[in-house]
């Protein structure tokens, strides 16, 4: 009887063990679907890993900060004697001192129109040799350090006008274009005179009726003048001119001349990322300075598909033209 009871207990234990093993085997597949929902690259990840991934996603989707530039107190007085802000999209002056037909002296801003006219008669890759025309350059004026015998392409001479504001480059282009107009080897002075006639005729045809040019570089003459209305027209022409805009925003470049390497630095500080006056929305154009014109600047700005032209003239110091321009640009954005 005792053996029978032990046998029954043994059978019950075997059945119980079998049931337990079966239950375990049956429960395992229920875990598989949950495991399949976990991506392979996150298997075994922790809450810390998940938080790190969320932070990384937020960082990659965050927009970069808005570019900044030098700003000034609202009550800062402009130093320029004459100035304007022009909206090229609405074709209107947003700010202007005096009237749009008031006569002003453009100084080296003249070189924008010199480039515009000259490159109509000269191919960009035309090789030009500096010669006697350099004798016509005013002593002590800004130059690109060109000497007689230097050879440079016409396009490179445009750069020489726009970066270091080379009056020597302006005369070389004027001479070359003047000769191309007549297809004759006239002397340097005659060639430049012919070019100046063409500059004035083109200004007239373009509606720049308040403008008269005497020389290709902007050295002061009482009869060398323009107006705000005509400068707007000039600025628009410059923005659309490939030869001008190719170099208008180049901060500096080292070039090789006969005398050795020369560094050309752009006189427009607004386009130089290393300069404290740098503005990421400034795209060019040209500075100027004479005793009568003061320190001046015609600038183009582009932001969010819009274009502005800003001119400041008669500034007492070189720095004033950049500070006034930035102040006017900031105020224009705030007024939108």
Task: Tell where the protein language model's regions lie, with residue ranges.
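Penicillin-recognizing serine hydrolase domain
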Residues: 7-9, 28-38, 68-82, 178-336
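Generic "edge-of-domain/loop-turn" microfeature
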Residues: 16, 90, 135, 306-308, ...
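N-terminal Sec-pathway targeting helices
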Residues: 1-14
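Extreme N-terminal leader/anchor segments
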Residues: 43-48
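Active-site-adjacent loops and short helices of periplasmic peptidoglycan-processing enzymes
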Residues: 30-41, 52-229, 238, 303
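Hydrophobic alpha-helical membrane-insertion segments, chiefly the h-region
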Residues: 15-27
């Amino acid at each position: 009887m005792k053996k029978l009871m032990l046998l029954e207990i043994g059978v019950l234990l075997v059945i119980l063990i079998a049931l337990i093993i079966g239950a375990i085997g049956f429960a395992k597949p229920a875990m598989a679907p949950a495991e399949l929902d976990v991506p392979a690259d996150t298997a075994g990840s922790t809450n810390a890993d998940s938080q790190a991934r969320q932070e990384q996603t937020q960082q990659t989707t965050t927009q970069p900060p808005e570019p900044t530039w030098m700003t000034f107190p609202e009550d800062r007085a402009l130093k320029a004697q004459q100035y304007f802000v022009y909206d090229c999209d609405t074709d209107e002056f947003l700010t202007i001192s005096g009237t749009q037909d008031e006569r002003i002296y453009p100084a080296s801003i003249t070189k924008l129109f010199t480039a515009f006219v000259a490159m109509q008669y000269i191919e960009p890759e035309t090789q030009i040799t500096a010669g006697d025309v350099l004798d016509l350059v005013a002593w002590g004026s800004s130059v690109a350090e060109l000497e007689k015998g230097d050879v440079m392409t016409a396009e490179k001479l445009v750069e020489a006008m726009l970066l270091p504001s080379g009056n020597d480059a302006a005369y070389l282009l004027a001479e070359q274009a003047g000769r191309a107009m007549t297809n004759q080897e006239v002397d340097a002075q005659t060639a430049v005179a012919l070019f100046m006639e063409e500059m004035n005729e083109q200004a007239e045809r373009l509606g720049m009726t308040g403008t008269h040019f005497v020389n290709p570089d902007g050295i002061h003459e009482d009869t060398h003048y323009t107006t705000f209305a005509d400068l707007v027209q000039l600025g628009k022409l410059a923005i659309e001119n490939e030869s001008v805009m190719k170099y208008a925003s180049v901060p500096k470049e080292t070039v090789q001349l006969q005398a050795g390497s020369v560094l050309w630095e752009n006189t427009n500080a607004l386009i130089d990322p290393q300069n404290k006056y740098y503005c990421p929305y400034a795209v060019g154009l040209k500075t100027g300075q004479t005793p009568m014109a003061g320190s001046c600047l015609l600038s183009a700005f582009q932001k969010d598909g819009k274009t502005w032209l800003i001119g400041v003239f008669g500034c007492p110091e070189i720095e004033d033209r950049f500070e006034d321009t930035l102040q006017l640009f900031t105020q224009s954005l705030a007024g939108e």
